[in-house]
């Protein structure tokens, strides 16, 4: 189901922001800008790329990250690369 997959990506991204990137997630929304609002820098992006690949099996490129302005954009970029499960499971 698309919703549960989306929710699972959202939950994992929240954990990555909190645990791996030391972001205070209480002040982060989907509309929060990654650099201006969340305060991510190049080191945080590198840590995030590794954590996303480790936890979700999704390899984002530097180009993918540069196209993301907000947390919601990042979530959508991850979601687009998450393999969809077979409908028959």
Swiss-Prot record:
It is found in: Cytoplasm. Its main location: cytoplasm. Pathway: Siderophore biosynthesis; mycobactin biosynthesis. Residues 7-82 form the Carrier domain. Acyl carrier protein involved in the formation of acyl-S-ACP intermediates within the mycobactin biosynthesis process. NCBIfam families: PRK05883.1. This is Acyl carrier protein MbtL. It comes from Mycobacterium sp. (strain MCS). The gene is mbtL.
């Amino acid at each position: 189901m698309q919703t549960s997959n989306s929710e699972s990506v959202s939950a994992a991204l929240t954990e990555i922001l909190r645990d791996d990137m030391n972001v205070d997630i209480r002040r982060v929304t989907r509309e929060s800008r990654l650099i201006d609002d969340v305060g991510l820098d190049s080191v945080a992006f590198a840590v995030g790329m590794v954590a996303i690949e480790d936890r979700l099996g999704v390899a984002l490129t530097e180009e993918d990250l540069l196209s993301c302005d907000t947390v919601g954009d990042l979530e959508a970029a991850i979601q687009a690369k998450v393999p969809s499960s077979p409908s028959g499971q």
